[in-house]
Structures are given as C-alpha cells and as structure tokens.
C-alpha cells in the first residue's frame, strides 16, 4: 500500500486478529484496484499474495468481528483527521437510500423495491445511508439496510421502515465540533418521524416536497400544486444558483403535520412551463437563494452512490447471507473513506482535491502492478522458474 493510504489503514485500530487484519487489507485493496466485477474471487486475484477467495468469504460471512465497531472507528478516524472549523460552519448531513439490483432469487432479504423514477420496480436490496458534506469534504457516515416486513417476520427480526432507519441515522450522527448541521433529504423523508429526529438533535432541515402536500391558510386547506397554478410565472424573481436560473416564489406556510415552514415554488427559467419543484425548510429566515444553494448539496450523495457502485463494487456482491451482505457494504464504505482521507491529505490541505476517486483507483492499481513486477524480478533473481513464480504469486502461467 502507498504510505498515506497505509497510515489511515493502520489508524483505524480495529480489534482484528492477525489473519482478520490481513483479510481486511485484501478486501480494502481488492475493492479499489479490481477492474472486473467485484466478486470475492476477483478481489482476491487483484491483490498480490492475497490467498484464496474462500478466506475472504470466511472473513466476511463467518469470522467474528463487529460491524458497528468498524463503522464507529471509521467515522472517528474522519473526525480526528478533519481540521477545527470556525463556529457556525455549515455541515450538511444527507439522508437517502439506494437499491443494489440483484438477479439471485435466493439471496436473503432481497425483494422488489420501487426505483428512483418512482415507477419501475427493481429486485435487490435497499440501503439507507447518511453522508456528511463540509465544503469540498465529504464522507459516508452510517448505513442501515431496509428489509421487507415479510422477511423480518420470517426471520424474527425487528422491522423498521425507511423513515425509522433515517431517524436512527440522524440521532446517531456525531458532527465535528462547532458546526451547524443542516439535514437534507428528498420528499420521501419529509414526515413527522424524520423531522422529530432532526428537532431532537437541534439540527435544521431542507427537503423537497410533493406537489400534493397540504397547507393551511386560515380555515382553508390547499395543496402546493394548486398554489403553483395561481402564480404569475413571468413576474417571479429570477435566482441563479450553480449556473442554473430559476423563477422562485417563496413564502411561509403552515404545512400539514409540520407547522410553520418556509416553502419555495421553483420553475426552470429556461422552461417555465415545466412542472415546478417544491422545497421546504424549517429555517424560515433563509433567502430563496440560500435555500437553493444549500439543497443543491444533496446531489453529492447521488455521485457518492455512483462512485461506490462503479469503482468499488458496492452492489457487486454475490453472498447469499444477509450478514455477509451488510459486512460487504460496511467494508466498501471504509475503502471509500480511506480514499477520501488519502485524497485530501496528499493535496497538502483538507480543502484541496488533487485527484478524482477514479484517478486514485488507477494510481493504486499502478502501485499494485509495480509491486507485482518487483516481486517477479526478485524471485527471478533467486533462480526460480517462471512456473514456480506463477504458482507462488497465483498468476496464470
């Protein structure tokens, strides 16, 4: 491993046995340098002198170690590495879920879930995660799999809704000292269960709202869609955020089950006839521009899901057991975190970013290949035959 990556790897201080620590290291490096589908065999073959794939299976499915301990130590490593922030620095905690599409019908806890488009259903697993963003820095925080109620009943496991899992992630979040936390989520999570958790932690929130969300005006009830139809779009003020222009109407409304809330009705300035997007927040004094700027940060969790799936094999697992699946997700989040920590540290500052995650993976892959060449040359100089070298390094002859 490169020195900076190894430094953070050792700083995790997980209470592993010596064999477990070795398998943990293989899983981390394999997740990063593997160019194929991230099966256990592919992870094992991607790392020099890693041993057999069955060792990785025993590590992820059978070996006794704590997932919660790994998650806590991973986040504590992030907190220990981050700089001290000025009082009131904004810290965004993003809540969302993502589906890991699968084809194996015998995988534990797999089921049909509604896709991101809200129409198409996908078979697989659904995970709810929290993601922390401070300026240019971002790290995954927590992960909780959502299991269907039927499966929970069959396995005598306690069932939690996605909203309850999101509330747990919010309650468990340990932010850096002195920051002001704003929780960002989409319309699915705009409900009393999640909002209660936000209020308990004395955080603030910004969310997208559904068009049928009801608000009270005096004794009358109306929904946001009806409000939008009454607006004169051509005379709304234009707000520019991140290179895009919006026509925005903002006001304070009493939303059903939420109380007094700042609401934004936003139209695409280039295509004002398109359906509006509704945003809501408990920070009633924020300007429309601030609300829009803050909510655009939520997109960072979408790019996070893309990166961990495309680069680190987050959804490539083939293990049938739910325990192994949950451990795989935690291990991938740890690999992502180590990459992020290496990325900022090698920049010489935690506010700069020298490489993309894809470039980091390619760089570590090159380092792995250079180490392989070094070992081949070393064994060749000792007089070993090509066949012997291939056997010892588990290479195709």
Label the model's feature ranges:
Residues 62-141, 147-149, 245-251:
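Active-site-proximal, Lys/Arg-enriched surface segment
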Residues 46, 77-81, 168-176:
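A generic secondary-structure signal
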Residues 32, 45, 62-67, 115, ...:
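Short secondary-structure transition/capping motifs
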Residues 1-12, 16, 20, 26, ...:
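Single, function-defining residue in the core of a domain
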Residues 1-68:
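Gly/serine-rich nucleotide phosphate-binding loop at the start of the catalytic core
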Residues 34, 46, 85, 176, ...:
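Alpha-helix C-cap/termination motif
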Residues 23, 35-39, 51-55, 65, ...:
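Generic alpha-helix structural propensity
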